[in-house]
Regions:
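Structured alpha/beta reader/binder surfaces that contact nucleic acids or chromatin modification marks
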Residues: 2-116
Length: 116
């Protein structure tokens, strides 16, 4: 992945918990799990109003069975015997790059926000 440019208005930021952020940045977690089918492309990785990295996400993979969920475990690393969402999607992480910056988002924002 080319060096990320400074954040622009409208850039997408995935809001993550600290554990998942660390696993993605280390390269151990290669699939993010979401309840929505996010578009492929560039996303910044955010935690507590800071940017820690940038990823390129591939086309979303619908996860519809427990067997598929278990097979994908080495990529998503979510330790659960059931699907986490009624509609579950795996977002393949094609590349990741660490960086730091700050951003603000609306109070209580979860999941994904756009840079303002």
């Amino acid at each position: 992945m080319a060096a990320p440019q400074p954040l622009q208005k409208g850039d997408r930021i995935l809001i993550l918990k600290e554990r998942w952020l660390g696993l993605i940045l280390s390269g151990d977690k290669t699939m993010e799990i979401r309840s929505k089918r996010l578009r492929a492309g560039k996303y910044y990785l955010g935690y507590k109003e800071k940017i820690y990295g940038c990823v390129s996400i591939g086309l979303p993979v619908p996860i519809t069975t427990i067997e598929q969920w278990r097979t994908l475990y080495p990529r998503h690393l979510v330790n659960s015997s059931t699907l986490p969402y009624e509609r579950t999607f795996g977002l393949p992480i094609l590349s990741v790059r660490s960086l730091e910056g700050t951003y603000k988002h609306p109070k209580g924002a979860i999941g994904i926000v756009k840079y303002r």
